[in-house]
Amino acid sequence: MKRSEKPEGYRQMRPKTFPASNYTVSSRQMLQEIRESLRNLSKPSDAAKAEHNMSKMSTEDPRQVRNPPKFGTHHKALQEIRNSLLPFANETNSSRSTSEVNPQMLQDLQAAGFDEDMVIQALQKTNNRSIEAAIEFISKMSYQDPRREQMAAAAARPINASMKPGNVQQSVNRKQSWKGSKESLVPQRHGPPLGESVAYHSESPNSQTDVGRPLSGSGISAFVQAHPSNGQRVNPPPPPQVRSVTPPPPPRGQTPPPRGTTPPPPSWEPNSQTKRYSGNMEYVISRISPVPPGAWQEGYPPPPLNTSPMNPPNQGQRGISSVPVGRQPIIMQSSSKFNFPSGRPGMQNGTGQTDFMIHQNVVPAGTVNRQPPPPYPLTAANGQSPSALQTGGSAAPSSYTNGSIPQSMMVPNRNSHNMELYNISVPGLQTNWPQSSSAPAQSSPSSGHEIPTWQPNIPVRSNSFNNPLGNRASHSANSQPSATTVTAITPAPIQQPVKSMRVLKPELQTALAPTHPSWIPQPIQTVQPSPFPEGTASNVTVMPPVAEAPNYQGPPPPYPKHLLHQNPSVPPYESISKPSKEDQPSLPKEDESEKSYENVDSGDKEKKQITTSPITVRKNKKDEERRESRIQSYSPQAFKFFMEQHVENVLKSHQQRLHRKKQLENEMMRVGLSQDAQDQMRKMLCQKESNYIRLKRAKMDKSMFVKIKTLGIGAFGEVCLARKVDTKALYATKTLRKKDVLLRNQVAHVKAERDILAEADNEWVVRLYYSFQDKDNLYFVMDYIPGGDMMSLLIRMGIFPESLARFYIAELTCAVESVHKMGFIHRDIKPDNILIDRDGHIKLTDFGLCTGFRWTHDSKYYQSGDHPRQDSMDFSNEWGDPSSCRCGDRLKPLERRAARQHQRCLAHSLVGTPNYIAPEVLLRTGYTQLCDWWSVGVILFEMLVGQPPFLAQTPLETQMKVINWQTSLHIPPQAKLSPEASDLIIKLCRGPEDRLGKNGADEIKAHPFFKTIDFSSDLRQQSASYIPKITHPTDTSNFDPVDPDKLWSDDNEEENVNDTLNGWYKNGKHPEHAFYEFTFRRFFDDNGYPYNYPKPIEYEYINSQGSEQQSDEDDQNTGSEIKNRDLVYV
């Protein structure tokens, strides 16, 4: 609410005001005016209503809002008026007989802390109507007598609030700010009514935070805001020197009001209503920032005062900044005063206590009031505090001198908005009201009335900087607040703005404060008895007068925006808090109080730094460790490779899982198992699936296998017979050197081979059980096929009988068909890649040139930036003289294309001969699965004729013959082939457009050549025409012997691998990403016993096939038995 706005429910109770000109009327006349203004005061029937009116008036008093400077020039006159009024205020009709009053009411009121004379007079005036009426009367009387003001406020609340335990309040010695207007007498609560009003309701803990704030409706509150919180009113007006205090620098860009005029509240306190204060209060009243009361949660004493819901903590509000003399104190009355972000440090306790004892200049020792420092520094201009002046006069000794705010009022720093930030445990400071309550009894009688020692947790403004008595000890209970000392006993959470009080020139203790000012140590002054010996204000300790207000040089910086978001900059915070902490031993008491604040805050300091620091400390051990991690940093391309292949394999695994489940269901249906048996089988499959997922993550290495013998050596790998260490099972292990795969650009081919071997779920393809890799090599662990390959058999036999050729070609047709059904093209069907198992049936192997037309099978996918390397399907310079290449002439394309084709001829690539490769593959004109049927025709020719149809001296000539197959293909008559065999060869070895098999393998199966083959039955179940001879499980006699010179030696392997791979790494390449998703483990791996244990050759031979193919059903039923598994396999 803007200052000039009138809150809802505003009542025109604006008392008479004094003229702006110098006041020259006599004291008697002034007293008359004041009395007239008092008659106009509203008289609410009950305290709550009065409080409500108070809140309205206090927050709405237009005089306070709009004419704050009006009395700025009347300090001297007001002081004179005060002096003249003091005798009247002190007059008590104690002579009246108590017989005229209700003894019970008298006793209750006295118990509440009211002076006997005051109570008797009130009861007499109200005809013993009710305690509330008496309290209301006392409230009016308190306008005339400052000491009564505090007692009325302190005592009335407990009574009206049914003496709620939470209503423990401390009387605040407050000097009435007799500005000559009843406005100054009326509690100036300009905030929203009760609920929102900063004015503390009688039940509100804040009401006590308005230390001495009178009952609502009573003018006491007005005085409370402006007067000492000791409950004692300093009757003798302070000398006019009070004016000497220069106004503090205007907040945030406001020009300082002329001296002697009370500037309107700072812009940051929109709702603060400047109150009229007595001349004494003209002194800068320490700006009360929303400092959380004493120890509440987190060490702050719980808000002892029963915070009435009417007075919710004003979290958004900020305390009042110190206002210099001549400047109206900023009254934080409206709960909307300071809508500090609740996140503000000051709001950490949830109460943005704008209520903070705005009236408190001095906080009792027990009170730990955290008041965020004003955004601007207090200047030494506030030469003498009203208390200092008063000490010189009849006023009670001020707890702070020279305009310096009492330690309780002092704010450690902007960051110390919460009690936890302040050292609630300050030695001298009594955080617990109960302690301070005992102090009140000891405190010098400030108001002559002993204010009940309700002991709310008194949050004292910890002026860690200003507080010369850094230890709250300075606020000892014995110490008596000066007349101007407003000892605000703020209930733990000050939920309502405290009544306005003179705020000392704001201390630049914000988080952005330039530097921690060198505070002048302030001598601890002994407490002087207040001029009016009134009962000791409970819990009201007098702050010794501050020697001198801190002097800042230059105006403070404006609040930065980030402060409003609870991010006070860390450096200022440290500059303020740390110096006091480090210099603690030598610092004056004010710094000691800051130390106490530091002590309390120490536990939360780091956390606070984390929350308030805008700068994140990056350099820590964890970060360094993270940087030093051994995990390699891969390129984005590597991530692309991994994710593309990983996602594909994850989806594939899911599909395979569904397939296995369906397969099991079909098998159980076919077998006709009972329901219980089916359920058991399903459970077993589920368990096996779970185990499989776990096993797939198990790392494998070559140490798990023992090499027995080398079976063959290829272009960049070798095949050897190996035994698995744990299961003793025999496997054929194919090892590929990564360096050769990379250099020959065979990554795509290896990936394609791995895929087809892993996906192959039929008996025509060698089964892959495991694939894994290490730093240097890739490993395929496959079925060991002891019968050797077709080439070895061809070499031994020379020419096959047509019946044997028919049998093998029929099985080869079925094998190629199975590969095509899986979506692959072998592209390298030749006798070397056809293996014969122990029962004489064939299996396809070596899918190094196989492709599935997948992006992972494309060599270009694995090439980055360099010029493209040629794969094994390109022409090799070993084929002949490159100058004889006629690719350009033959293709007749653009010259660039011809040049590229010629480069292919020059490129190193294919190892071996192109005898079995279809012409479209060599020409790269585009090919389909039909290219494999070409190879079948060539193999049939070789079986029956004894040599390939396109045999030549060099690979290049062979390639030329293949390309010119129309003229080079001749079936020699001496071979004496049957017309069916010749016709089949001719129909398979022709152009793809009319090649047999174009419409599927059935075309081939229907050819007359296979008229004696029953493709409808499983060929593998038929007896083979040739059964290889196997003498023992590790018999390798069916394989051609390996040249010892070509054998891999471990030493050479290490040297070659290291040299080659080091070269790759030196060039900045990371080829390892080419082998992502290479690892594989078969679901049905025969438990590691593809052939069981070695048995007699005959027995093994008979049951070999069954043992190779696993049956999930049998596997689950027989447990360790591994034979006859042919139902479920992958």
Curated annotation (Swiss-Prot):
Molecular-function GO terms, alphabetical: ATP binding; magnesium ion binding; nuclear estrogen receptor binding; protein kinase binding; protein serine kinase activity; protein serine/threonine kinase activity
Domain Protein kinase, residue spans: 705-1010
Motif (PPxY motif 2): 556-559
Tissue: Expressed in all adult tissues examined except for lung and kidney.
Interaction with YAP1: annotated segments: 526-655
Active-site residues from the entry: D828 (proton acceptor)
Ranges annotated as spanning the membrane: none
Gene Ontology CC entries for this record: centrosome; cytoplasm; cytosol; glutamatergic synapse; microtubule organizing center; midbody; nucleus; postsynapse
Enzymatic reactions: L-seryl-[protein] + ATP = O-phospho-L-seryl-[protein] + ADP + H(+); L-threonyl-[protein] + ATP = O-phospho-L-threonyl-[protein] + ADP + H(+)
Short motif (PPxY motif 1): ranges: 373-376
UniProt entry keywords in alphabetical sequence: ATP-binding, Cell cycle, Cell division, Cytoplasm, Cytoskeleton, Kinase, Magnesium, Metal-binding, Mitosis, Nucleotide-binding, Phosphoprotein, Serine/threonine-protein kinase, Transferase, Tumor suppressor
Occurrences of domain UBA (ranges): 100-141
AGC-kinase C-terminal domain boundaries: 1011-1090
PANTHER family from the UniProt entry: SERINE/THREONINE-PROTEIN KINASE (PTHR24356), SERINE_THREONINE-PROTEIN KINASE LATS1 (PTHR24356:SF138)
Function description: Negative regulator of YAP1 in the Hippo signaling pathway that plays a pivotal role in organ size control and tumor suppression by restricting proliferation and promoting apoptosis. The core of this pathway is composed of a kinase cascade wherein STK3/MST2 and STK4/MST1, in complex with its regulatory protein SAV1, phosphorylates and activates LATS1/2 in complex with its regulatory protein MOB1, which in turn phosphorylates and inactivates YAP1 oncoprotein and WWTR1/TAZ.
Membership in a protein family: Belongs to the protein kinase superfamily. AGC Ser/Thr protein kinase family.
Protein name (record): Serine/threonine-protein kinase LATS1
Native organism: Homo sapiens
